[in-house]
């Protein structure tokens, strides 16, 4: 009996949940380190190390992203953009540096089954005629002052606050984690760095604009309406 009880504690339950349930309405997934099954979604993009999956049955909660990254370089050969698939895997939180916010993803995907192909993939529009990011406040932890708490983005993951995407910049982008998006009216505000990454701002209201065409970071009214674009995706 004791041996059976010990084994049961080590076994991770396999849960049938949706993508939005996996992402949840906070920065970290409520299913972290748990095995999940029968995850259904539309393949929206592929990278060299995995692919992105969007729920085919979205909910009405704008705090929970409908998309998620599937991390596995071998799995990409089994699917194409536009496929509707189901799979199982393990929910993980990943960041490549302790100063970064975690990204929710599914690792070790298995039981990948394609139910249909050549489905239309429509990106979410951010900017004119689409979603607009908030422009005044960074997060619910800094009390309106980007130079105050949390002082670095990693503490967001420690507190794991409830997302408020219409109010806070970090929450807005987190609510779109893993999503394929079209951003309108992009304007570069820096030169490319050594990796070719460029900070840009889109066709949405922003604060801190300066005479050089860039954005100035300042406390109490700092804009969180720009971002760094660097991921290369396969969309066909």
Predicted segments, located by residue:
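Fungal secretory targeting signals
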Residues: 1-16
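Extended non-catalytic accessory segments flanking core domains
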Residues: 15-236
């Amino acid at each position: 009996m004791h041996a059976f009880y010990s084994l049961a504690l080590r076994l991770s339950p396999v849960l049938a949940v949706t993508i939005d349930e996996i992402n949840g309405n906070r920065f970290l997934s409520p299913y972290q380190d748990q095995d999940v099954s029968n995850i259904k979604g539309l393949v929206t993009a592929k990278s060299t190390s995995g692919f992105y999956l969007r729920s085919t049955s979205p909910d009405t909660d704008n705090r929970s992203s409908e998309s998620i990254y599937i991390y596995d370089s071998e799995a990409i050969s089994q699917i194409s953009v536009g496929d509707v698939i189901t799979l199982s895997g393990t929910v993980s939180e990943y960041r490549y540096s302790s100063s970064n916010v975690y990204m929710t993803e599914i690792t070790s995907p298995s039981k990948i089954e394609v139910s249909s192909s050549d489905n239309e993939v429509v990106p979410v529009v951010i900017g004119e005629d689409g979603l607009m990011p908030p422009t005044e406040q960074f997060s619910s932890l800094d009390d309106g002052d980007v130079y105050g708490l949390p002082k670095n983005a990693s503490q967001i993951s420690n507190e794991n606050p409830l997302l408020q995407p219409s109010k806070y910049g970090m929450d807005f982008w987190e609510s779109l984690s893993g999503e394929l998006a079209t951003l309108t009216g992009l304007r570069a505000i820096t030169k490319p760095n050594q990796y070719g990454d460029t900070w840009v701002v889109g066709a949405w209201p922003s604060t801190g604009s300066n005479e050089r065409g860039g954005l100035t970071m300042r406390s109490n009214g700092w804009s969180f309406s720009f971002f760094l674009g660097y991921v290369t995706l396969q969309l066909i």
